[in-house]
Structure formats: structure tokens, C-alpha cells
Amino acid sequence: MTTPANAQNASKTWELSLYELHRTPQEAIMDGTEIAVSPRSLHSELMCPICLDMLKNTMTTKECLHRFCSDCIVTALRSGNKECPTCRKKLVSKRSLRPDPNFDALISKIYPSREEYEAHQDRVLIRLSRLHNQQALSSSIEEGLRMQAMHRAQRVRRPMPGSDQTTTMSGGEGEPGEGEGDGEDISSDSAPDSAPGPAPKRPRGGGAGGSSVGTGGGAAGGACGGAGSEDSGDRGGTLGGGTLGPPSPPGAPSPPEPGGEIELVFRPHPLLVEKGEYCQTRYVKTTGNATVDHLSKYLALRIALERRQQQETVEPGGPGGGASDTGGPDGGGGERGVSGGGEGPEEPALPSLEGVSEKQYTIYIAPGGGAFTTLNGSLTLELVNEKFWKVSRPLELCYAPTKDPK
């Protein structure tokens, strides 16, 4: 059966789409106009699909006209895969390929320094292989851990600002009668240095009170020693027996060595402490196993000692002394002394340290600048730092007098 001629012509007719029927044809460039094209935009055209590098000794397939590097396509055919890597068209052998020197000339025109480009690629690969391997990663991790440990040790040993005025508050660890304490050390920069260790008695000159609350004892002894009173030195030595914690029973094991030191800033509570009251920011450095009760009692002792020092400074002299050196405006005698010698009236009682307790002050913390949280007295500072603070700067605590200490 023969097919009509018009049917054969109709099968060879190219049917145009609606877009192709209405689009405007582009005008051919007939003059010497040049168009700038970046080499990066030609990268996909100049790249071998097998090695993904620039074509070298280009070979073109005769069937599908795809281009490959000569070494790449020959290796692919020898591996037994007799088809085009791009379109899977049948390739019998190397006879299905032909060299394409025109394309090589085009590449050499675009990249005249091909050897320099390849040398640069080799240097980049060598550098990557040297830096990006398991050994380099391990050495980098070890170096980072070593640097972190070194900086952490420096941060622990770094002195606080004003460390030349730092004093140590420590409980004695010797015989039970010499000085009782837990062994924690708390430093504050609000008074001059004092040597740690209790002293049974101080000379009349006062000096620094070697005590667990060394700053207060020393200041009180020094203030009263200037007036020549014998009992001021005794008080300076007696204050040296103050401790931060309950006394250790005889024969009890010594406390463990502190695991680390913690720096903290002690501020008065901005809401609960009135501006007229005694309030002072304190910078303290202590061991991590000190508890909140230790800080409360330390604070109560310090404030009591400093108030006692203030009272002794305002009212100098002592029982049995001579004429007071604090004369009135009219040249008369002092407030407590009797001019002409003789025994003066009894000195007013100074604030007692026997009733000092950790219940007198409450410690607060404001994690993240939020609401204030009351700290339990049994919490250690290390636990407080891990639970509430979690930042790499000194722990900030607030204190306020307890409303109903019991």
C-alpha cells in the first residue's frame, strides 16, 4: 500500500509552537562587535564531564558530539563501559572518537598560561592534603585544649584589682585551743594586709590582728593602741579567734583541700538595704567549698568589727588613762578623761562579737540580671557558681540584714 505524497510532506513539516510563531527573531551580528564574556561563565563548556577539569587533548564522539579529555574517555572505554558517559549512546571503540584541535586552540586562546594554571592547581591540592587530614585535625585539637588549659590556669591565678590591699581570713587548723575554723580562706580588699594565724596577745601598739578576720582585728587593735590602752591589744588578739564556721571537735579529720578558688563581688541589696545604713561593696576570693553560711558569718563579723573600730576611733582613750587628748572647743578636758590625771569613768561597752551569727545577714543572687533569689546557707559557692551564674566573670552576690534572725 502506497502512502499519498501529501501525507509524506506533512510528516516532515516542523510544527512551530505558539511562542515560536510570535517571537521576534534575533538579528545576526554582521559587524566587528565584540562581546565580553567572563571565563567563569564558560567553565561548564570547557570542562570535561569525567574529571571535572579543563579539557586537555580534546576528543569528540562522532555520534553525539560530546567532548572529553583524551585520557579520560580512553580509560572509560577500556574499563568496559562502551557508551558515552554523558548521554549513554553506543560507542564501539576509539574509532568512534575524533580529535578536536579547534577546541584546544580555543582553550589556549582563552587561557594562554595553561601551565601556570595547572601549577597553581597542584599547589592548592598539596596544601589541602597537608592541612585537611586526620593528623592535622588531631594536632589542632590538642593545641586548642592546651591553650584552653593554660588560659584557665592564668585566670585562676590572676590577682584581683587592688590585690595589694588584700587580706586573708582563715580559720586555724592547728591544735583545738589555738584557733577554730574550717580552713577556708576568704580575702577582702577593704582593709590592709594581715598575717594569717591566731595570736594569743598583741602588744600595746595594736598592729594587724592575725586572725581569721584579720582585717577587723588589726584595725581595732591599731585604733585603740594609739590611745595607750592595754586592753586594746588584748582585743586585737582576741578577735583573731573569730571563725567562719562551727568549731571543729578535737580529733576530727582536717577538711579536704579546696578544689579551686572563686572570685566574687559582695554588694548591698539595692532594694532591702537603705542608703543611710552601713553598706560597702566587697571583693572576696575564697575556696569553692565555702558555703553561703560561711559568707554570712564572715560578713557579720566584718561589719561588727568595723563598727567597733569606728566607735573606738570616735571615743579614744581607755580606763585608767591620763588626760584625754581630745579636748573640747573651750579648751576643757576630754569627754571621758579627767584633766590632771586620776582614774576616769568606765569606758562604754563596745559591740560584742559573741552574738555574731550567720543568721544576721541573708545572701541573694540575681542570675542573668533577673529577680533576686535567696541562697540556702548549706550551698557551696562552687555549686552556686555552676547552678546560677554560668558566666566567666566573678560571682556577684548581694547581702541584706535578715528581718527576723533566729
Curated annotation (Swiss-Prot):
Start and end residues, zinc fingers (RING-type): 48-88
Catalysis: reaction(s): S-ubiquitinyl-[E2 ubiquitin-conjugating enzyme]-L-cysteine + [acceptor protein]-L-lysine = [E2 ubiquitin-conjugating enzyme]-L-cysteine + N(6)-ubiquitinyl-[acceptor protein]-L-lysine
Listed EC numbers: 2.3.2.27
Phosphoprotein among keywords: yes
Main location: nucleus
Modified residues (Phosphoserine): S38, S140, S187, S190, S229, S232, S248, S254
Ranges of compositional bias, category Pro residues: 246-258
EC primary class: transferase
Location of the motif Nuclear localization signal: 201-204
GO cellular component, one term: sex chromatin
Assembly behavior: Component of chromatin-associated Polycomb (PcG) complexes. Part of the E2F6.com-1 complex in G0 phase composed of E2F6, MGA, MAX, TFDP1, CBX3, BAT8, EUHMTASE1, RING1, RNF2/RING2 MBLR, L3MBTL2 and YAF2. Interacts with CBX2 and PCGF6. Component of a PRC1-like complex. Component of repressive BCOR complex containing Polycomb group subcomplex at least composed of RYBP, PCGF1, BCOR and RNF2/RING2. Interacts with BMI1, PHC2, PCGF2, RNF2; CBX6, CBX7 and CBX8. Interacts with MN1. Interacts with USP26.
Name assigned to this protein: E3 ubiquitin-protein ligase RING1
The organism of origin for this protein: Rattus norvegicus (Rat)
Gene: Ring1
